Amino acid sequence: MLDVSVIVPARNAAPLLEECLAAIVRAEPRELIVVDGLSSDDTVAVARRHGARVLSDDGRGVAAARLLGVRAAACERVALVDADVVMGDGALAALLDEFAAGGYTGLQAGLHSIGGPGYWGRALAHHHRSGRSRRWFGLVATVFERSVLLEHGLDERFLSGEDIELRRRLARNGARLGVSERTVVLHRFEDGFAFARGQWLADGGGLARTLDKEGWRGAGLLALPALAAARGIALSVARREMRFLAYYACYLVFNYAGMVRRRT
């Protein structure tokens, strides 16, 4: 049995959660916690069927859900795993071993992103596989010492982007953060324009909130969506993948729309 508490935030995630939790259960962690965000589907039933301890964040969002799970966890190490992640056999144990051997403050698994059969799901996955963000530390499938998250916390006002704010805050405090190249997990994107648009708006809002907190230190974040879109467009043209141009145009527009919405 692995001495770790696995925390999975989930809201209306029943179709994804089944495979996610089955993989976690096979890894035999000491504790599995699912934090439900007032789901209207079978999320809670799926969690209980896999033996998870189920908590509710009362719909306060993913940052609040993660922190609630950390506070309730019994183990000294916690693994934050999103419902859209599937960990292969041995992946959790390997990530824990690398975390301990490398002296990390936080270590995220590498992500192999896949999307649904439609345009927007495939485009989201393509962006995350080819973009620089795949090497950025985040909270998608990540191991921490519980005490670190209790000390530094997560800003519960964030709907998205709290991982960027936490990463920058921990880095300023000398934390050792990393993304594993040895342990890679499956990261699944839902399909449809509505899902993609919601992601972009929430991400833009998260960047704006980080800017509000950091002031001049966060000024570089203003250029982040533009730089990512420009890189994606340039690569699409160079590789003759012109079908992705519409994706990057929408990514650019709705990220900045999310930033403006947050600041008005």
What spans do the regions from the language model cover?
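Acidic donor-binding loop at a coil-to-helix junction in glycosyltransferase catalytic cores
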Residues: 160-168
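Non-catalytic, C-terminal membrane-associated alpha-helical segments of glycosyltransferases
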Residues: 194, 198-264
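Short, acidic, metal-binding catalytic loop of nucleotide-sugar glycosyltransferases
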Residues: 22-30
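Conserved donor NDP-sugar-binding/catalytic core segment of glycosyltransferases
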Residues: 86-119
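A conserved acidic beta->alpha catalytic loop
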Residues: 23, 36-44, 85
